[in-house]
């Protein structure tokens, strides 16, 4: 179900990056050896290091290159990376090597390999799990934390499944009926036919305030392994678009968030049908010390739909 997200996000990248010379994701990156694997990074700008942690799980860094201009007239250095099993980084011989814990430890491994002192993290969607997990375990190494359109627990991720399926059943009954027929025959989320049927639902329907922002474009240079479906279903469970399991079916940060000491910014979109608002606002209870901002004309990607406001918010947050 989520594979389409990273296909569409190639459009986001090509449509939002400004006409300025920045490092090239294909030619200007650097590898670091971390926990027995080579991880690919691209660094933009100078200043306080801010790691951008992609969503998925399974997505590469390229869709987020539209954030490059955060480095203009600011003291921010963006560090993009392809996590283990994604993009240009090494992949596992056994899918069981993929885990949330591994992703968290790889952030710490990258920090050390890059000889950085304190870092900041911006985790989007699934990336927020990695960011929150890192903040809880390695808070002493963290300067700022941004939870962007994120999830605080497996309960919230299950609501993602439930709400998405409800919306599809209600608004795309022909897709839902086809899906139910193959499920009755034994198909599950990780099966290719199941993923293909889910892909008939336009991305913007579930993820956008203005779906037109996510239509067309593309045609750019292919990027290797932009989304690893095998990794995705290893981490969300084999039928993870209906019932979350594996790592995603067990994470829960709700009781620990209130103890975090670093500055925290939590971003949500009013029209997000994935990281749903009624679950997002619970962050105010679980992490009362954070600054919480609801973007009223955005879905799952306020950095695209309310770009100017989003960029201003991040730049201001990173100053303090």
Locations of regions flagged by a protein language model:
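Short beta-strand/loop motif that positions the catalytic acidic residue
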Residues: 260, 266-268
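Acidic catalytic loop of the alpha/beta-hydrolase fold
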Residues: 271-275
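Flexible "cap/lid" loop of the alpha/beta hydrolase fold
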Residues: 146-188
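Conserved acidic catalytic loop of the alpha/beta-hydrolase fold
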Residues: 101-119
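Conserved HGGG/HGGXW glycine-rich cap/lid loop of the alpha/beta-hydrolase fold
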Residues: 31-91
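Catalytic active-site module of serine/aspartate enzymes centered on a nucleophile-bearing elbow/loop
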Residues: 290-320
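Conserved hydrolase catalytic core segment
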Residues: 117-161
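Conserved alpha/beta-hydrolase catalytic His-Asp/Glu region
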Residues: 183-239, 256
